[in-house]
Amino acid sequence: MLNDEIIEKFLEDKRLEGRASGTIQEYCFRLMELKQYLETVETPIDSLTGNTITNFVRFLRRKGQKAQTIKNKLSTLSVFEKWALKEGLVSSTVVSPDYYPKSTETKRIRRLSDTELRVFKSYLDTLQENARAAFYLMMGTGCRVGEATHLRVSDVSLRGKSVYVDIKDAKWGSDRCIPITDKKAAQIVWRYCEGVEIDTRPLFRLSKRTIQGYATTFAQKTGITFRCHLLRHTYAALLTEQGVPMPTIQYLLGHKSLGMTAHYTQSAITDLKDLTPEI
């Protein structure tokens, strides 16, 4: 059976390969869920079949999980199977893209409108200094909320007259050192950093859940559909509108592929007047 000892050995090997802590944590959560499922259906890890995978997908669907979430979990299982094959724990691998669920809807992700951004910035002015600075950091870098809340004071530095943020242990190994590209955001974050006490606590002294709570409050107060991740989409879209090359945006966001970056930039407001002939 798939047990805790096998999972821990897999995770340790992935740590030695240099996988980010966030990736290791995701692997752990997903494999523990698989372990519980296999125990329920009394199936050893070395006896997986296509039918097992199909039923696992149905199980996740019944729990209300989205196609992309299930795809990510099967991807983790595929990585685990390849490792288990090398370790001699299984004689063959089963998971393939053929088992990945197909998404039945393609939503166009919108960015915050200019008016909504102004309303949001007014809301930020009512928050405590640390929360205000955290949101401006996300607006000025496009970083994930988890990346912002894990920063330390030493991760923010001044290079010349530009403010840089060193993001470490990021999701999917997307560590990067990036500038705060918005002037006002850079000024607010740096002013906060200059006044904050240097100790072992996170830079903003806030949890991911607390930041998300502020986002929920904003949505409830204004009626604007909002969540923290929308700032990341908005950042990418605004850079696209400014003509920033896609590979540059890919690096700033920490994406592995241009395809993912394109998904984030699709809400850019495109000016077609130069392409539109007059008659």
Language model regions located:
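N-terminal core-binding DNA-recognition domain of tyrosine recombinases/integrases
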Residues: 4-108, 123
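Active-site-proximal segment of tyrosine recombinases
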Residues: 147-148, 226-227, 236, 243-257, ...
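Short, charged phosphate-coordinating catalytic segments
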Residues: 138-161, 247
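Conserved tyrosine-mediated DNA breakage-rejoining catalytic core shared by Y-recombinases
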Residues: 150-188
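Basic, Lys/Arg- and aromatic-enriched nucleic-acid-binding interface segment
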Residues: 114-145
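DNA breakage-rejoining catalytic core of tyrosine-based enzymes
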Residues: 90-92, 103-119, 172-183, 198-202
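Catalytic-site neighborhood detector that most strongly recognizes the C-terminal catalytic loop/helix
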Residues: 111, 253-278
